[in-house]
């Protein structure tokens, strides 16, 4: 029987509708909350979920799958868990946790998920990057050879840092660890102003973990006043944020820094501080019923920090020659650097800057213990001129500390010992520096050169800072520029007479 045109039209319409019926359907795997509390949700029914996958709760809060068990999945909640109830639906997103990255992030303050919290609207053009990626392999790397200047005389001369290095800042609370980190960010301002290309610019990422909101607010204000926020990104997971966000923040900040590293640029990332991240991870692990180990930390707490810090690297020329330099911060208790987390991070990093409360209260600020501080790879990146002028200073300081202990007994000292004590006292005074006042490298070289060559030996200690200010302002700009290339016999002639003359005027 032949269909009428109208019936044929209807048949075709039905066929196309049936064929396309399932085209717009999206099949989601969903589970149900079995129990929830303390930022951890146990969910039943997500059988195909991946480790580290993002999930979405019914109230819009996000979470991440950490424990994959036979029956349930242990999910950490990125936000408040008070609105999540037993029996609520949980949906898989199919994607691993990622955050925004790119130049649009510069000047912004974001949370651990990359959501802006500075009240300046949504982010403009950016890309999404996974928070957990593998560190660059051996062939993709190059040895550290470019200096990363902090603007601090004590650091740039005695424990130099190179681009792509990991240098630990370790010390008790209130010893100036954050101040060194902030000074380093501020010092990049004058380095970036001289940069002739994008590949010379240093971008900064500061990750605040478990700090007070007021402290983070002061920090933002300091960076804004110095116009340093324009080349910086701030990632804040404050003390009032849930433990999962404090755990995630360093990885999010690292992903943002890797954008610059992988695109042939240079970035500096500061984790302030990783002790609080370890405590947050311990809290999550214990709530997920993972077996505790030393100091109740889980067995993989070393891997927590090693996989993060290994992502800081200097890339080879074939892979863009970018770099990511890391300055992790660790807080010790009563100067105990042999505790679990401090020893872990010391063994992962390429050196450490040790700060001490006693030195801080004696007025030696930055309170760096030169004897315990070391930079394992930084000397290869140190400026030639700086290496030449401060070569003997570390040895002289060590001899001074040894002799100073005996000198306290007040016995008669010979002329050589007296000269050593004089020189050591001046070499201890020269590295002192006020906070948020980084010094350009060429001015540091002049000041240290004067101290090492004995021009300050007869000068009263309280006049050294005055001498320091007088030197660079009177030296010819050409000499300051030339100092960056290293000292030669010809270059030494000019500053010698001038520095001695200045010193005599202040004796």
Curated annotation (Swiss-Prot):
Localization annotation: Mitochondrion; Mitochondrion inner membrane
Coiled coil: none
Gene3D superfamilies per record: 2.40.30.20, ATP synthase alpha/beta chain, C-terminal domain (1.20.150.20), P-loop containing nucleotide triphosphate hydrolases (3.40.50.300)
Keywords carried by this UniProt record: ATP synthesis, ATP-binding, CF(1), Hydrogen ion transport, Ion transport, Membrane, Mitochondrion, Mitochondrion inner membrane, Nucleotide-binding, Transport
Main location: mitochondrion
GO CC terms of this entry: mitochondrial inner membrane; proton-transporting ATP synthase complex
Pfam families xref list: ATP-synt_ab, ATP-synt_ab_C, ATP-synt_ab_N
Site residues by UniProt (Required for activity): 373
Single GO biological process annotation from the record: proton motive force-driven ATP synthesis
Top-level taxon of the source organism: Eukaryota
Residues where ATP binds: 171-178
GO MF annotation list: ADP binding; ATP binding; proton-transporting ATP synthase activity, rotational mechanism
Self-association state and partner proteins as the record states: F-type ATPases have 2 components, CF(1) - the catalytic core - and CF(0) - the membrane proton channel. CF(1) has five subunits: alpha(3), beta(3), gamma(1), delta(1), epsilon(1). CF(0) has three main subunits: a, b and c.
Function summary: Mitochondrial membrane ATP synthase (F(1)F(0) ATP synthase or Complex V) produces ATP from ADP in the presence of a proton gradient across the membrane which is generated by electron transport complexes of the respiratory chain. F-type ATPases consist of two structural domains, F(1) - containing the extramembraneous catalytic core, and F(0) - containing the membrane proton channel, linked together by a central stalk and a peripheral stalk. During catalysis, ATP synthesis in the catalytic domain of F(1) is coupled via a rotary mechanism of the central stalk subunits to proton translocation.
HAMAP family: ATP_synth_alpha_bact
Family statement: Belongs to the ATPase alpha/beta chains family.
Name of protein: ATP synthase subunit alpha, mitochondrial
Native organism: Brassica campestris (Field mustard)
């Amino acid at each position: 029987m032949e269909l009428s045109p109208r019936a044929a039209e209807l048949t075709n319409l039905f066929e196309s509708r049936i064929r396309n019926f399932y085209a717009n359907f999206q099949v989601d795997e969903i589970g149900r909350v079995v129990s929830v509390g303390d930022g951890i949700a146990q969910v039943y029914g997500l059988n195909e979920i991946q480790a580290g996958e993002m999930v979405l709760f019914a109230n819009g809060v996000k979470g991440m799958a950490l424990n994959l068990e036979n029956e349930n999945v242990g999910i950490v909640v990125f936000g408040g868990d008070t609105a999540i109830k037993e029996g609520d639906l949980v949906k898989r997103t199919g994607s691993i946790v990622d955050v925004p990255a790119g130049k649009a992030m510069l000047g912004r303050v974001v949370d651990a998920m990359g959501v802006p919290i500075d009240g300046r609207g949504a982010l403009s053009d950016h890309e999404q990057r996974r928070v957990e990626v593998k560190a660059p392999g051996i062939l993709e790397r190059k040895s550290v050879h470019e200096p990363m200047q902090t603007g601090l005389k004590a650091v740039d001369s005695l424990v130099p840092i190179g681009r792509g290095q990991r240098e630990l800042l370790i010390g008790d609370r209130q010893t100036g660890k954050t101040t060194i980190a902030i000074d380093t960010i501020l010092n990049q301002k004058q380095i970036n102003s001289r940069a002739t290309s994008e590949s010379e610019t240093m971008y900064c990422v500061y990750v605040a973990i478990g700090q007070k909101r007021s402290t983070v607010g002061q920090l933002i204000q300091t960076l804004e006043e110095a116009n340093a926020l324009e080349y910086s990104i701030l990632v804040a997971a404050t003390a009032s944020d849930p433990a999962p966000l404090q755990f995630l923040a360093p990885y999010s900040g690292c992903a943002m820094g890797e954008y610059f590293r992988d695109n042939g640029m240079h970035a500096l990332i500061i984790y302030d501080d990783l002790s609080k991240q370890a405590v947050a991870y311990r809290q999550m692990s214990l709530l997920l019923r993972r077996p505790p180990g030393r100091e109740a930390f889980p067995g993989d707490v070393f891997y927590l920090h090693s996989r993060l810090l290994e992502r800081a690297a200097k890339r080879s020329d074939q892979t863009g020659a970018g770099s990511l330099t890391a300055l992790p911060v660790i807080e010790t208790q009563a100067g105990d650097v042999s505790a679990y987390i401090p020893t872990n991070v010391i063994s992962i990093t390429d050196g450490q800057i040790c700060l001490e409360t006693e030195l801080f209260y004696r007025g030696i600020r930055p309170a760096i213990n030169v004897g315990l501080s070391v930079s394992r790879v930084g000397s290869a990146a140190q400026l030639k001129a700086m290496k030449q002028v401060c070569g003997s200073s570390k040895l002289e300081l060590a001899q001074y500390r040894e002799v100073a202990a005996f000198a306290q007994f007040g016995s008669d000292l010979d002329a050589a010992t007296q000269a050593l004590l004089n020189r050591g006292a001046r070499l201890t005074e020269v590295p002192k520096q006020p906070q948020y006042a980084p010094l350009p490298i060429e001015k540091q070289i002049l000041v240290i050169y004067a101290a090492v060559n004995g021009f300050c030996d007869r000068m009263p200690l309280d006049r050294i800072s005055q001498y320091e200010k007088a030197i660079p302002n009177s030296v010819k700009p050409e000499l300051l520029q030339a100092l960056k290339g290293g000292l030669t016999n010809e270059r030494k002639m000019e500053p010698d007479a001038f520095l001695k003359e200045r010193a005599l005027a202040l004796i």
